[in-house]
């Protein structure tokens, strides 16, 4: 067994060695390359097939040798780098192919010119054979077209780095290709032989017919020529994508000899957002790196492998400005000194210079966005292979920085003494592990020492024991440090905060803007400046329009100039360095202090290109070149809006004054619905072939590779609309031929109209001055119609009505006439406004649209308020009738421009209709009288006939009765007996005989002697019984007949019945009136008194007396009613209990329209009554009002009170007995203030009646403010639905509090990974007792106003989100001035205004009146609505829950900014906050309303210094502000090349498009016109001041559909995507992600914990701490700094000693372990793997986030984060969000 296993093991290992050997892999790759067929195969096959004879064999040999030689060159190019560069570049094909193709073309066309005749001595002199060899050699180097070999080439390149013996790999791959090629050619030969031998195939050829013999012979003779033409076409197809290297125009680069003006451009070309780690900004992917480190005015540049040392000397001369010479005022010299010691020249190969297709004259693509102006040069791939040390071992890294490797190679070449001794791998690893062990031990010792110091030195503070962060110091004596923003030793938040700046804003620091008011007062008087540049800067600083309003406005004002260049900042510094010597205006100018900046430049292309789209938009008019360099998608600019009003900016320039008369236009780009083949490529650049994409639609949104077809949801390769096909089949089956014909006619008619309309439009365009004539005619027609024709018609109509003794309708007609609007439109139909004409309307054309056209009516109908159903029906009927039209040249109206005229409404048509109706009525009146008379006569005759017949029948019946009585025998005992007429059935006779026999038998037995007598008696009795039965039956039958006759329905009987019913109904109504007469009379008296006293109410003397009289009479009446009701209720209670509320609810459910109106109630009366009643809890009123159980009187009955008490709505017994304090507030706000029951309907549904009643009563016992019990708190089940009350402290508490907070965050970090149990509450049990601490300290720590409004606070860090205000609202600093008592030291707290978000707002969110893009300008203070929830309704629930409980979802995982809508009341804000109005000038000041408040502000200012000492964070926050200020200044410098916006509206449009149009939404054809109509209406509504009327009318007409406005709540985007209505096209932007963004998107979980909850006297929140998980446990590692802490954890977790030190490529070594030993250790490997997975899952969320985020830039060296995210997904498990 052991022997067998040994043999098997050897065989397996042998097989593995053979498979992994270099020779086998090379053979495999070589065999695969045979399938990549190129154009050289055509030559080879032609030589093998077409050529025959001795020359043919020679051609075959030369073809095969050339083919093999070409392929050998390709394989050698894999090993030899210069040859690979030469053959791999596209310009190689350009240089080699074009001349050779021309030669080949002339060779085949003019054979006699090159033919020297064949010589048998030396066939190599024959040029034909040489050309065959060259054809196969050269064309083998060209691109392949049947199976492209790019994938194979990549595999070969990867394996070349893995294997050691590279030459063996190349030779083996060539041998493999040779084998495959021989097999392929043999297969081709066999196929040809089979075709020759098969007669059936040869017989089908056209040669057998005599007609085509000549053609076929010609075809064979000219085969070479046809072949050369085809080859030329294929090669031109390839060469068409390649730019010509000689004749293309080179782009103009930016000149580098611009002195100091060009210097800032070179030095600051990097992304504007600096990250926390400045080294992350460095792009290590480039060879030509340019490093620039300015220290003390010196600069080092590494550019194009040349080292220069440039020294800039900046001199400022001591000048005298007596003569006013401008040239000597600002002198600057630039001196370039070249040092020969630092000058090094590195050669460049000729191949890279000639054949670098990207460096030849232009790049492939030009990627430009807001962050990067010039495109980055990308000379190499983002993957670069090189050896590096990782974990103590030397490994091949595929993302090694290429600049380091090239630098190392250059140094090795130039410095001969530089040698690198390679140490063995085991020794390197041992050294590395030893080093890490030492580090771990040092950290352990330091950690233990610090812990011991905690126990020993208890008097020391925690701050001294904690590890301090190290700072980078460049001057130890003065202790000067680097700024925190640039300090490499600082990590995380201490590196400074980044202001999120908008891309179009030109930001100036607020300190500079405010300080500008006093700069010129001092220096402007003392200093005389003659330079033009100084004048501009002074003009900028003299502007005093800067205020907080404009600083925090939604759109920044246009700023033509900005303080961003280095020179201007130096001039600004110059103002502070001026020293005045004497009156002769001599100035001594100090030398400038150089600006030290550590930065790094990325190599970029030296030119800037503009696209065709930018030229169309007209941007950057100053710097735009003559021709755009980038080919953009075909588009047209459509002018939407022109603004004549000037916008006053912060900074102005001379250009604004010059162009003040010009109009400010807003244009949108309209794209054509065609595929974009241009793809923003640079003109003349390489057109790369897109092999991976497959396009099957005419216009496909998302082009992708066939590899991803499995991810498509469709079943088939092409989309198959099954439901659409089914509908079509059903429709075709159901419809008849007539309908089809009718539809065809309609379609033809509409097509005719459309063609006619197009023809008319084309005719107007064809003539030269037609648009001028048409435009002038349209304007005259509109003026004539509006101001002459229609007023004349109104005058004629009303004068004729007055003559005909009818009331004239002047007001109605004039109202309709004023409503008509003539809107000017562009030639395409885009609406502008009534007064605004489109640009160049005389040349481009104009359309005039008539909105609400006036039609003259003979009379106006009275508008009765119709129901909603009637209104909807009316809208449906009017759906086809359009309430607008376009004006024609002849004064007619059309539905579409250049369409057919509409039929006018006739003025006389309704008159004729009315006349016809009246004539008909007049005719029908006499005929109605005759018809009624005839009906009455027929009824009378019918009644008389019926009566006559009834009398006759009664008489006949009586006669028949008399005859029957005479025939009968009278028996005295039994009455009348009939003998003759007996009708007995057989059955009755048989039964009677049986009974008689039985009776007779019994009698015989009992009474034997008298049996005969008894029998006779019995017989007689039986006979009499039978007769009686028969008689009763007959009588009953006759009665039935009589009743049937009498009950027949007659006309008079119906009348009688209906009259009875009417009488009964009248009786009931009278009873009801009698019953309710008292209330009716009372209501009448009230109405009469109100109407009587309304006229006299304005007289002041009478009003008071009247009011008292009215109130006294009303109280008397109410008391009387109340007594009567009480007596009635007592009687009812004695009999039975009637549930009043249930009956009332039943009444309401029966009649749903039943409602009451409380608007008629007087507010004064309500407050008067409330002051009389001693009740405080009126929250029941709200509940009653919400359920429409509205009662006119506010005296609620006892039945309602009992019912509410049973249901738990309120507790009547626990009402407050104190007097009610009625504040004079608005009525609606007073009612809304009682919001205890404003819970969502889900909460109401879950609550059980009785339990909820008990709990809510207990809760209100605590919440009642007047009760004495303060510390009572009981936990109930509706805590989740109650409004949580939280606050945020504005300043840091003491150090212990900070430590506790830090422990909570750290413990959360630990427990969120490991704990998979129930959710925990991280609240801390910190109670604030009012006895121990003063009120002043409490007020100083916490914000009073926040505590007051604590139910509405949103405990969320709003600094993360951006607020976008539409109008410039005065948002000042909110000042807390609520507490006005003198003995309390209140501190003025400045904090940001935060939206009030409650559960009621989230549950009952109602969108305000139709507002889109700010068209409802009457409401200035609301926010922009975010339509993300209407598209993605599934996120709405999560967002609403997050706003009330933000600890559920981390804030960084929310994908949107939810902008809440809010209307700010100006009166309230004036009372509570101080702000600076826009027209106020001067320094920043706060104003208060009361003197006490001013005193408090003064106290707050005095306490600021003391607060800095007490509060450690105040100084830190100031430092952060300084960092932000410096950061803003640096950003100001770096934004000088940014896009200058011409106008305010252009910036607004840009912001709107970037914020809301990040995705291009495309729609289907049937959805297209509807949306376009909506957009046209929007464009009109944007320009109107009060667009409410037009918006409503357009909604009614159907022009503006609400479903497109996304007002529906369940309007989901996924449904539209599935239906195919909307298709999203993402705008792909090349954005360079910031390091801070990467870290804080992964690390920063900004949770607001429950420890920020309100803790007051009445609320002591209990801390719910799980027993198993001690979340507030002390973490000793916090003693160390975060950096050392992370390092310590990683070193502990990595088991360095047990790690195997073998290399990855060890399987190629000879000293490989035996397979059996590996198999035995499988279990241990599995355990290690499990521990490694645990280790990774432990390290990922805690310690390695920053390292992995940096790894995206360093280790993986990618500009996009896709590779990084994929690695993260595969390596690390997902974690639940807690």
Swiss-Prot record:
InterPro entries: TIC214. GO terms for cellular component: chloroplast inner membrane. Keywords: Chloroplast, Membrane, Plastid, Plastid inner membrane, Protein transport, Transmembrane, Transmembrane helix, Transport. It comes from the Eukaryota. Pfam families: Ycf1. Coiled coil: none annotated. It is found in: Plastid, Chloroplast inner membrane. Residues 1498-1520 are annotated as: Disordered. GO terms for biological process: protein transport. It is a multi-pass membrane protein. The chain crosses the membrane at residues 18-38, 67-87, 90-110, 132-152, 175-195, 226-246. There is a partial copy of the N-terminus (positions 1-341) of ycf1 in the inverted repeat (BAF50071). Belongs to the TIC214 family. Part of the Tic complex. Involved in protein precursor import into chloroplasts. May be part of an intermediate translocation complex acting as a protein-conducting channel at the inner envelope. This is Protein TIC 214. It comes from Arabis hirsuta. The gene is TIC214.
